[in-house]
């Protein structure tokens, strides 16, 4: 946002996913809320109309869908691991909801530099299929180059992702 001198609003929660999270709530449940844990609090989407929306979700899902004994896995999926169609549809529905809120925005569906983008990962393909299914020329995919690490991205890795996103926006979106 600083690079483009743009207004910035962020909706984020550590450990959150689209289909399952490390905590009880998933992003599709809290996105429309003013207060994440209050299901009766509704955000007024007319208050802010972004030109660009960047979505960086699915990293937490990549781990949790493989942990069948985790309480949140059991809560969301019972004893059955979600299949590719379920994951793609969940992502697609979330992005379709964003489009309904932001009908003119460019939406960038991204994955960060953690293991969701590791060579051989299926998750970029899930995002690509979901976006293709939307048939919306203003919804894009952009995947950050994988950076091997044993932890969350450090300052330099965050800068690398910012640089990658800046370049993508500058070359793809009529800003």
Annotated model-derived regions:
Residues 91-96, 127-128:
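Generic structural signal for well-ordered alpha-helices
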Residues 2-6, 94-106, 133-137:
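A structural motif corresponding to the C-terminal end of an alpha-helix
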Residues 56, 110, 144:
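A cross-family glycoside hydrolase active-site/sugar-binding cleft signature
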Residues 150-175:
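Histidine-centered active-site loop/cap adjacent to the catalytic His
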Residues 87, 91, 158:
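Aromatic/hydrophobic pocket-lining residues that form the small-molecule binding cavity
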């Amino acid at each position: 946002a600083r690079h483009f001198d743009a207004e910035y609003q962020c909706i984020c929660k550590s450990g959150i996913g689209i289909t399952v999270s490390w905590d009880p709530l998933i992003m599709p449940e809290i996105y429309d809320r003013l207060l994440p844990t209050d299901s009766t609090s509704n955000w007024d989407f007319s208050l802010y109309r972004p030109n660009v929306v960047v979505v960086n979700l699915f990293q937490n899902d990549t781990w949790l869908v493989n942990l069948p004994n985790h309480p949140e896995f059991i809560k969301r999926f019972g004893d059955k691991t979600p299949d590719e169609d379920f994951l793609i549809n969940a992502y697609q529905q979330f992005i379709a909801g964003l489009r309904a809120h932001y009908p003119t925005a460019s939406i960038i569906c991204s994955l960060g530099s953690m293991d969701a983008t590791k060579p051989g990962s299926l998750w970029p393909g899930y995002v690509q299929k979901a976006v293709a299914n939307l048939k919306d020329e203003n919804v894009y995919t952009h995947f950050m180059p994988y950076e091997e690490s044993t932890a969350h991205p450090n300052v330099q890795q965050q800068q690398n992702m910012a640089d990658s996103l800046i370049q993508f926006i500058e070359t793809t979106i009529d800003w």
